[in-house]
């Protein structure tokens, strides 16, 4: 009987002690909450700025961060194919690519022009600015295909030897052709004659022995430093050029003054040829004494073996005497 009574008395004492400590603990927690976030309750520990190092031992920092075997081991496995799809269906067969190139040919002439002998469009070999095409020093051996809108062509300092009949076909707006410093020795008759708008033909420093048939709209013809002979200029060929104003044939192999000359001519350069004589009607019509070539003011015959003093009646219709050796 004494033992049970003793245990009951001990239980009552402990219960009373625990009840008495509750107000103190609650008061302590209220004080910590009143001070803001300076204290944190972690289980049975009260963590604050004054006892941080007492609650958590920082000397074994690596041990604190060592999770050991707590993390599960990740295993890499293959995903099973979706339900309803067999393994044969899930395997894709790569498509075999053909190594043979496919050639695509353009159906129309592009803005860059058709391919030339180099295999590239003309405007990639030359420089195309508006209606002007510049092919200077491009190592060309032929006239390249040109855009239909070409108005001015410059193909100087190349290796062109021949101008063919179809080189300028369809270029109805072409006004100027400059082929200086090439190796042109022949021009087909229909290469230039059918160009309705051609005004300036510049051909110095080539190897021409004869002039081609020219369109009637031509105004400037420059064929200096060639191998032109008098037999290479067809009779009446120049008279038909009713708009021709400037004719430059210096430094050739001419042995006579070409003619008859058109009335529109303003300048005639024949210096450094082989001219020894001239016809009395080379410039003036001896039967028309009142006729005057008032536009022809620039005639150059210097550098020829001719003596201009021997032909005084040949200049009466001219506003100025020719330049050359006299007396």
UniProtKB/Swiss-Prot annotation:
Chief location of this protein within or outside the cell: secreted
Q: Could you tell me which residues carry Sulfotyrosine?
A: 61, 67
Q: In which tissues is it expressed?
A: Ocular tissues, cartilage, ligament, skin, muscle and testes.
Q: What is this protein called?
A: Opticin
> Does this entry carry the keyword Kinase?
no
Any signal peptide, and if so, which residues?
1-19
Q: Which GO terms describe its cellular component?
A: extracellular matrix; extracellular region
GO BP annotation list: articular cartilage development; bone development; collagen fibril organization
